[in-house]
Curated annotation (Swiss-Prot):
Record gene name: rpmD
Pfam families with a match to the protein in the record: Ribosomal_L30 (PF00327)
Keyword Magnesium carried by entry: no
Transmembrane segments: none
Protein family: Belongs to the universal ribosomal protein uL30 family.
NCBIfam families (UniProt xref): rpmD_bact
Protein name: Large ribosomal subunit protein uL30
Length: 60
């Protein structure tokens, strides 16, 4: 079974490039300090890597 990751948006997307905004939205994060739980898949890990400066990640 894949591990679960708890992803929290900790920095704003204001002033960020459109691709980073789209990645944050694709992760399901809409507001600051919003948290989602996702399965650890290569796609999700790539998205986290792209916006790692905006989010914090913990194992759920």
């Amino acid at each position: 079974m894949a591990k679960k990751l708890e992803i929290t948006l900790t920095r704003s997307v204001i002033g960020r490039p459109q691709d980073q905004r789209a990645t944050v939205e694709a992760l399901g994060l809409k507001k600051l300090n919003a948290t989602v739980v996702k399965e650890e898949t290569p796609a999700i890990l790539g998205m986290i890597n792209k916006v790692s400066h905006l989010v914090t990640v913990k194992e759920a």
